[in-house]
């Protein structure tokens, strides 16, 4: 893996793929959010952004992942393992994982495979879990419809540290007109502001 480099940041953060400089991952921070930028990290494959900063005097790390269609669980697990030292209790991992994390995340209710189990084990070891599933353990709502398979799934996720769950008020799946995926909206308790994430 090539060495990553911290570089100055702006209010719009994106990675560019090699093909026609196509943007693969983008993170937009609203001007209404009191976000103080510190640094940004991009990986060579243009599928990950790690954004460091502060909101309302609290540190926050946003890890935005766009996983490949094939081998997504293994890819995400490798990212988490390679950059474990950069991930702490102030980190929120978001993005299109291109994989469900549980049986509830599939309309077919098909069991998850061993690679997803392994990814979940890694998250558990890091004390991270699916924020949406923590608030809605039995609710079957989805973020993506596959016209090829005729099935719905929740492949877009927000993952947070267990110690940070108390900071969040609610999380919901919302419609999006700029993507073929639905978005996720995370609302913090009164000290903070609303977070809204959707795949562009």
Question: Which residues are covered by each model-predicted region?
Answer:
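A shared catalytic/ligand-binding motif for oxyanion handling
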Residues: 1-200
């Amino acid at each position: 893996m090539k060495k990553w480099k911290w570089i100055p940041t702006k209010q719009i953060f994106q990675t560019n793929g090699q093909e026609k400089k196509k943007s693969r991952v983008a993170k937009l921070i609203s001007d209404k959010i009191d976000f103080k930028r510190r640094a940004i990290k991009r990986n060579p494959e243009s599928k990950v952004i790690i954004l460091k900063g502060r909101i309302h005097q609290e540190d926050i790390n946003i890890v935005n992942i766009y996983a490949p269609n094939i081998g997504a669980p293994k890819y995400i697990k490798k990212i988490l393992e390679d950059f474990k030292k950069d991930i702490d209790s102030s980190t929120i991992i978001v993005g299109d994982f291109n994989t469900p994390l549980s049986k509830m995340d599939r309309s077919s209710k098909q069991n998850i495979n061993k690679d997803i189990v392994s990814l979940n084990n890694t998250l558990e070891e890091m004390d991270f879990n699916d924020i949406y599933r923590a608030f809605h353990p039995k609710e079957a709502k989805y973020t993506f419809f596959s016209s090829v398979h005729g099935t719905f799934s929740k492949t877009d996720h927000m993952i947070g540290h267990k110690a940070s769950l108390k900071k969040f008020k609610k999380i919901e799946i919302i419609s999006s007109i700029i993507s073929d995926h639905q978005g996720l909206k995370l609302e913090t308790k009164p000290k903070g502001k609303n977070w809204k994430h959707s795949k562009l």
